[in-house]
Amino acid sequence: MVESTGARATEARISRLLDLFCCAGGAGVGYKQVGFEVVGVDINPQPNYPLPFIQADALTLDPAFMASFDAIHASPPCQAYSDLAKRNRNGDSWPRLIEPVRDILARTGLPYVIENVDGAPLQNPVVLCGTMFPELRVIRHRLFEANFPIVMPPHGAHPLVHTFDRRKNHYGKTDERKDYVQVTGGGNCTIVAAREAMGINWMTKREINEAIPPAYTRFIGKQLAAYLAAQKMQEGEHTAVEYRRLAS
């Protein structure tokens, strides 16, 4: 039996992922490392985004364009849900986009992930922490909501964190090139230490302060890739059964 070139090409096609609210690409690069073909979308210019990029409003994208992808990741603005907004009581100054983003993603029918900070109104989220990844030296809790199963790794104890921020109870200088560091505007670790701690080598300090480590989405991306592969296998089995039924 000769297998058609078209069939082989379809079977070997790389899965495409749409990275919404992509900023400088912490999430997108993690998916890329798994093997996804990633396209980023952000309403603001992102000159340091290291993958194909489209400047556009994620809330008004053409549904047909979104449907051309296999999965979608979204990191809507987190400021309204942040600890800082709660302390300053100014959360209403920022847009709350999780609900409208969820509605848009659900309508696509595609597997999706929504990422945000602790306290964000995500549904049954998985929590990822830097302590779960040996290559990282940040705490960096982030929530991930998905419409496919994600297994969370064990969550270990938090080590002491290097920071210059006097508001933190772990204030004090140690060795920022070896210890855990606070990668935020108030943490004030150097850009070199921040890049090493986060596994990111292409962002500015301001960009990295708002980023998630690629290790997080690399971890989720592996499970997403397995989910997509299982879906394709089921679709193939269904097609084979239907073919046999029609041919009988």
Describe these PLM feature segments.
Residues D42, Q55-A71, C78-E242:
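Class I S-adenosyl-L-methionine
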Residues M1, R16-D19, V192:
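Exposed boundary/loop context
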Residues A12, Q33-G35, N48-P50, M66, ...:
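Short, well-ordered coil/turn elements that cap or connect secondary structure elements
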Residues A9, K32, P45-P47, A120, ...:
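A generic structural signal for short, solvent-exposed coil/turn residues
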Residues M1-I14, T60, A229-S248:
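Short intrinsically disordered terminal tails
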Residues I14-S15, N88:
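Short, contiguous strand/loop micro-motifs
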Residues R16-D62, H73-A74, Y81:
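SAM cofactor-binding core of SAM-dependent methyltransferases
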